[in-house]
A protein has these predicted regions:
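Non-catalytic, solvent-exposed interaction/assembly segments
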Residues: 6-19
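Short amphipathic alpha-helical segments, especially helix-boundary/capping motifs
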Residues: 11-14, 36, 114-115
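Generic structural hydrophobic/aromatic packing signal, biased to beta-strands
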Residues: 12-14, 52, 89
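Aromatic-enriched hydrophobic runs in primary sequence
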Residues: 17-19, 39, 100
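Charged, compositionally biased boundary regions
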Residues: 82-157
Length: 157
C-alpha cells in the first residue's frame, strides 16, 4: 500500500427501492466492506440495495446486492495502490490489483445500475469526467436513479 495513513470518507450511504420509492441511510462504518454487504443483503427489496462510498475526494465505490448476487464497481482502480479499502474492495470483487503504471480507469461491473436506467456508457463517462469530484459523480448517479432529493436531505441533516 502507499503512504495514505488516514482515510476519510466524504460520505457513505445505502439506498434501497421499496414500494415504488427510494429510501436511504448513512452507513456507520464505511471501511468495513463485509459489514456493508451484510447490511445490503438484509434489505430484501425488489430493486436490491446499493452502497455508495466516496473516499478522500479521490474515488468512489459502489456495491449492489440483488438477491444472492453482489455487484462491485470502483471509479478508479489505481486507487487500490494507495488505499487499503480500495485494495480490499478489489479482492472482494475478484479483480486484479493494479500495477504502478496502470491508467486510472473504472473497474468492476459497469452494468451495475443498467436495469435502473444508468447504463454502462453513461457510468463510464461520469468516471472519465476529470471536472467532477467523486461526491459529484455520486450525486449524478443518485439523480439518474431517482433518489437525489433524499441524498441531499441526508447530507444536509
Amino acid at each position: 500500500m502507499g503512504d495514505v495513513s488516514e482515510q476519510t470518507q466524504d460520505f457513505a450511504i445505502e439506498a434501497w427501492h421499496e414500494d415504488g420509492r427510494w429510501s436511504i441511510a448513512s452507513l456507520p462504518d464505511p471501511d468495513d466492506l463485509t459489514h456493508i454487504i451484510d447490511r445490503l443483503k438484509k434489505q430484501q427489496t425488489n430493486g436490491g440495495a446499493v452502497a455508495l462510498i466516496t473516499i478522500d475526494d479521490e474515488f468512489f465505490l459502489a456495491i449492489r446486492v440483488l438477491g444472492t448476487h453482489v455487484k462491485f464497481f470502483i471509479s478508479d482502480i489505481t486507487c487500490a495502490i494507495d488505499y487499503e479499502v480500495a485494495a480490499e474492495f478489489l479482492e472482494l470483487a475478484d479483480l486484479d490489483q493494479p500495477e504502478d503504471d496502470d491508467e486510472p480507469l473504472p473497474a468492476g461491473d459497469l452494468d451495475i445500475f443498467s436495469d435502473l436506467g444508468l447504463h454502462s456508457m453513461e457510468l463510464s463517462t461520469l468516471c472519465d469526467d476529470a471536472d467532477l469530484f467523486p461526491d459529484e459523480q455520486i450525486e449524478a448517479i443518485a439523480n439518474r436513479l431517482g433518489f437525489s432529493e433524499q441524498l441531499t436531505e441526508l447530507l444536509e441533516s
